[in-house]
């Protein structure tokens, strides 16, 4: 066996360990073989077969005789009773006749008679399709007859007892009878369909009128550009400025062509690539505020202070003094829309260069362009912005103040940088008579409350 297992001619050529392992292997096998030997004397089929044959032998022959008859038939108790009644000669049968018919036809019901016979009695008494007929005195016997209701013969589909249409009710049967009678009369008589014609015509009229109402409302609500419909309805008036901003706003306010909070916010949030002289005109006219701004001294001052305040509230890093912020700025690309905006701002005034607010409007334009420069993300001002004496002079028709042409001292720059926050506290009488934006800034009262006994006076410096 060692030679057959390892395919070696000489078993002595193997080592000690394989030899010992083989010896242990065969020794263990011999042990299990000796244990299995006495068990094989009495095999399993010899021990259990006679006992099983003796205990289950009498019932085995009966199961092979009729295995299919012991399966419950797929019919309900109502179907079984109906079969028994229909197979009777007079279409009526007693309760015992029903029992006998079921047991003769289906061997499954030969067992457990008490259970299914009780169910048969319940179905006879609870279903309206079964009618109890009293027994005639001429025929001897006990118990009444059971028959089917004449209207319940069609309760099974196509005569199959496996499927019933619905539970039979006498009320439903009487209604079906009436419907059948009406249909039969309608076929025979002619005026009955003529009476139904007005109802049919009314239905047609209702169907023709009903779709007109939603069509009319949809046309009125979704009118694209109607002149009278868009002006009369409140929804169209509310949506007119949002749909056509460039056309409706200049018609309503032909004289309002100045600056507003929306104008400064639009100039500040426009992208860097669009900062050219041409798109500055539709940008300002399209986003002008709905409230007109008349160019008087009081309204222009309040608008200017409101613009500064709005720029401060929306973004805390923007200040209104362009001279204070120009200290930290460097070079700037030269394609700016400020020169064209300055020319438009001065040309659109009512009195031209004779307006007392000419220099203030120029200051506001420069300030709005300054906000636009600082909002584009870390970019710096243009060279003409840093050197106003050399580069702004080429703009004809513009007069700049002496304080714009010269740099202030260091203290004034930081002072104006701080006073940019205080622009919301300016009143109309402080700004009305001034033509330069620096003077109302210096005379503005401080909005801070100092806890020290002395107050910080801005006008000293």
Curated annotation (Swiss-Prot):
Q: What induces it?
A: By activin and by smad2.
Key word Transcription present in the record?
Answer: yes
Signal peptide from the UniProt entry: none
One GO cellular component term of this record is: nucleus
Q: Which SMART domains match?
A: FH
One Pfam family cited in the UniProt record for this chain? Forkhead
Q: Where is the composition biased (Basic and acidic residues)?
A: 171-186
Keyword presence, Protease: no
DNA-binding region (UniProt annotation): 72-166
Q: Which InterPro entries match?
A: Fork_head_dom, FOX_domain-containing, FOXC1/C2-like_FH, TF_fork_head_CS_1, TF_fork_head_CS_2, WH-like_DNA-bd_sf, WH_DNA-bd_sf
Alphabetized, the UniProt keywords read:
Activator, Developmental protein, DNA-binding, Nucleus, Transcription, Transcription regulation
**UniProt cross-references to PANTHER family, sorted A to Z:** FORKHEAD BOX PROTEIN (PTHR11829), FORKHEAD BOX PROTEIN C1 (PTHR11829:SF68)
Please explain the role this protein plays, according to its UniProt record.
Transcriptional activator. May be involved in the dorso-ventral patterning of the mesoderm.
Q: What is this protein called?
A: Forkhead box protein C2-B
């Amino acid at each position: 066996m060692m030679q057959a297992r390892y395919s070696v001619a000489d078993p002595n050529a193997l080592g000690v360990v394989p030899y010992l392992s083989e010896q242990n292997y065969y020794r263990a096998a011999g042990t299990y073989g000796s244990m299995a030997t006495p068990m094989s004397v009495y095999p399993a089929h010899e021990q259990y077969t006679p006992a099983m044959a003796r205990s289950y032998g009498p019932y085995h022959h009966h199961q092979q005789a009729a295995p299919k008859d012991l399966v419950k038939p797929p019919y309900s108790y109502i179907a079984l009773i109906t079969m028994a009644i229909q197979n009777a000669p007079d279409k009526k049968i007693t309760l015992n006749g029903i029992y006998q018919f079921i047991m003769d036809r289906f061997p499954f019901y030969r067992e457990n008679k008490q259970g299914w016979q009780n169910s048969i009695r319940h179905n006879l008494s609870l279903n309206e399709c079964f009618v109890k007929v009293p027994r005639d005195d001429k025929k001897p016997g006990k118990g009444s007859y059971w028959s089917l209701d004449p209207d319940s013969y069609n309760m099974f589909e196509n005569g199959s007892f496996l499927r019933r249409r619905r539970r039979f009710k006498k009320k439903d049967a009487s209604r079906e009878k009436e419907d059948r009678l009406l249909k039969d009369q309608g076929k025979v008589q002619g005026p009955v369909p003529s009476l139904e014609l007005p109802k049919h015509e009314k239905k047609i009229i209702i169907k023709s009128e009903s779709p007109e109402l939603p069509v009319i409302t949809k046309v009125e609500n979704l009118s694209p550009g109607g002149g009278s419909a868009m002006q009369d309805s409140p929804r169209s008036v509310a949506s007119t400025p949002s749909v056509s901003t460039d056309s409706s706003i200049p018609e309503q306010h032909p004289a309002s062509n100045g600056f507003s909070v929306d104008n400064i916010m639009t100039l500040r949030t426009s992208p860097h690539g669009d900062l050219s002289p041409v798109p500055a005109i539709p940008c300002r006219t399209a986003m002008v505020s709905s409230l007109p701004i008349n160019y008087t001294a009081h309204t222009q001052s309040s608008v200017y202070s409101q613009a500064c305040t709005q720029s401060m509230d929306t973004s805390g890093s923007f200040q209104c003094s362009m001279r204070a912020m120009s200290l930290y700025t460097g070079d700037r690309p030269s394609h700016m829309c400020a020169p064209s905006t300055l020319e438009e701002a001065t040309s659109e005034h009512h009195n031209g260069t004779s307006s007392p607010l000419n220099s203030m409007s120029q200051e506001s334009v420069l300030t709005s362009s300054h906000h636009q420069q600082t909002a584009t993300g870390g970019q710096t001002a243009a060279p003409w912005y840093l050197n106003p004496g050399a580069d702004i002079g080429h703009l004809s028709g513009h007069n700049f103040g002496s304080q714009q042409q010269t740099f202030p001292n260091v203290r004034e720059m930081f002072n104006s940088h701080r006073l940019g926050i205080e622009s919301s506290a300016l009143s109309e009488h402080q700004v009305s008579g001034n033509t330069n934006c620096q003077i109302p800034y210096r005379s503005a009262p401080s909005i801070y409350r100092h806890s020290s006994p002395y107050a910080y006076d801005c006008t000293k410096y």
